[in-house]
């Protein structure tokens, strides 16, 4: 599944599969300018840290075209402001800022080049980011597959699959890698309230691929583990701190605690671009607080009384000591994570 992020050069637009409507309807959301990109990111037309990064890279290309169409001679500060808007669209997923800063660095490497030259260069850079993400996910899948045994039931939370990346997936990349290695496994997809990424998106992806998947209520995790129905847990991440603390979709921390209680290995799968070496630990990761209507309503139906406040934190942080390993394109990192993360970046030349 790699059709969900598509750049159309002829129309100078980014075409996104609108994930808000899956699995019952497949509808495209077309981005033609910065406003469209920011909206797509904020309302979660596209979500998942790597996919957010790829979208941001293409968003920079659209911002450059938008700047060119304005005809302003002093275009550099205008363009810089547009791409900064993209970088600030969502606070937790570090790949968003990473992608924009990579595009900005490419811009600076050109010196005083004109806007037409920058557009060409940025288009090629966005293609590289897009292509590289798929290749990185496949490498992670190969490394992570070694952690999965034949016959395992693997639990996952939220959606860290092809839809959350440029293709193949991080946590689901590990699952796909295990299946491609000939292992007979099943998947338990937690529904993942309130946006239901597990029930809607993970189940959709795996069912399309013919990988056995069962959706579970979030609050059934403990029972399933106690009954021996879960052998491994693999999740993605939106930001990993330098010490290995990992921010992922709200509820992940609870799953990790339950896994520790029941002696079940809990793994995080994420590319090096999701690791923020400038963030020392999880206490310094910003946690997005989203609109209350995601909790108070299911679709158009209100389920809570008027006037009752809600908590809608989009992410929580799983401390490093609960994580058995972090699957990256450089291999599976083990504790102590501060050292293994630093070594992985050294090996990658970053």
UniProtKB/Swiss-Prot annotation:
Any one of the GO BP annotations: L-methionine salvage from methylthioadenosine
Record-marked site positions (Transition state stabilizer): 158
Catalytic activity: 5-(methylsulfanyl)-alpha-D-ribose 1-phosphate = 5-(methylsulfanyl)-D-ribulose 1-phosphate
Active-site residues, Swiss-Prot/TrEMBL: 238
InterPro entries in the record: IF-2B-related, IF-M1Pi, IF_2B-like_C, Initiation_fac_2B_a/b/d, M1Pi_N, NagB/RpiA_transferase-like
Pathway annotation: Amino-acid biosynthesis; L-methionine biosynthesis via salvage pathway; L-methionine from S-methyl-5-thio-alpha-D-ribose 1-phosphate: step 1/6
Keywords recorded for this protein, A-Z: Amino-acid biosynthesis, Isomerase, Methionine biosynthesis
EC class: isomerase
UniProt keyword Isomerase, yes or no: yes
Domain of life: Bacteria
Known EC number: 5.3.1.23
Binding-site list for substrate: 47-49, 90, 197, 248-249
Pfam families: IF-2B
GO molecular function: S-methyl-5-thioribose-1-phosphate isomerase activity
Function as written in the Swiss-Prot or TrEMBL entry: Catalyzes the interconversion of methylthioribose-1-phosphate (MTR-1-P) into methylthioribulose-1-phosphate (MTRu-1-P).
Family: Belongs to the eIF-2B alpha/beta/delta subunits family. MtnA subfamily.
NCBIfam families, per database record: eIF-2B_rel (TIGR00524), PRK05720.1 (NF004326), salvage_mtnA (TIGR00512)
Protein name: Methylthioribose-1-phosphate isomerase
Organism: Nitratidesulfovibrio vulgaris (strain ATCC 29579 / DSM 644 / CCUG 34227 / NCIMB 8303 / VKM B-1760 / Hildenborough) (Desulfovibrio vulgaris)
């Amino acid at each position: 599944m790699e059709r969900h992020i598509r750049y159309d050069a002829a129309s100078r637009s980014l075409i996104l599969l609108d994930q808000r409507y899956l699995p019952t309807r497949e509808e495209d959301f077309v981005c033609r300018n910065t406003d469209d990109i920011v909206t797509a990111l904020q309302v979660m037309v596209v979500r998942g840290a790597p996919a957010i990064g790829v979208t941001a890279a293409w968003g920079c290309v659209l911002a450059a075209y938008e700047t060119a169409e304005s005809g302003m001679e002093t275009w550099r500060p205008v363009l810089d402001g547009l791409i900064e808007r993209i970088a600030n669209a969502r606070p937790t997923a570090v790949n968003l800022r990473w992608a924009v800063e990579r595009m900005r660095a490419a811009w600076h490497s050109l010196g005083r080049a004109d806007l037409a030259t920058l557009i060409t260069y940025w288009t090629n850079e966005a293609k590289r980011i897009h292509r590289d993400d798929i290749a990185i996910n496949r490498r992670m899948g190969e490394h992570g597959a070694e952690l999965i045994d034949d016959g395992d039931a693997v639990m996952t939370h939220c959606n860290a699959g092809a839809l959350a990346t440029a293709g193949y997936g991080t946590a689901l990349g590990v699952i796909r890698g295990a299946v491609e290695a000939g292992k007979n496994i099943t998947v338990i997809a937690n529904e993942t309230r309130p946006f239901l990424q597990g029930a809607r998106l993970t189940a959709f992806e795996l069912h399309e691929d013919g990988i056995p998947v069962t959706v579970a209520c979030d609050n059934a995790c403990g029972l399933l583990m106690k009954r021996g129905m879960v052998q491994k847990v693999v999740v993605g991440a939106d930001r990993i701190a330098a010490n290995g603390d990992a921010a992922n979709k709200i509820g992940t921390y609870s799953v990790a605690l339950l896994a520790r209680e029941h002696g079940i290995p809990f793994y995080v799968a994420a590319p090096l671009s999701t690791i923020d070496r400038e963030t020392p630990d999880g206490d310094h990761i910003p946690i997005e607080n989203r609109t209350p209507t995601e909790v108070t309503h299911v679709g158009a139906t209100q389920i809570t009384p008027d006037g009752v406040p809600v908590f809608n934190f989009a992410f929580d942080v799983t401390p490093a000591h609960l994580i058995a390993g972090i699957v990256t394109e450089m291999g599976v990192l083990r504790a102590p994570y501060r050292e293994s993360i630093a070594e992985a970046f050294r090996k990658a030349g970053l």
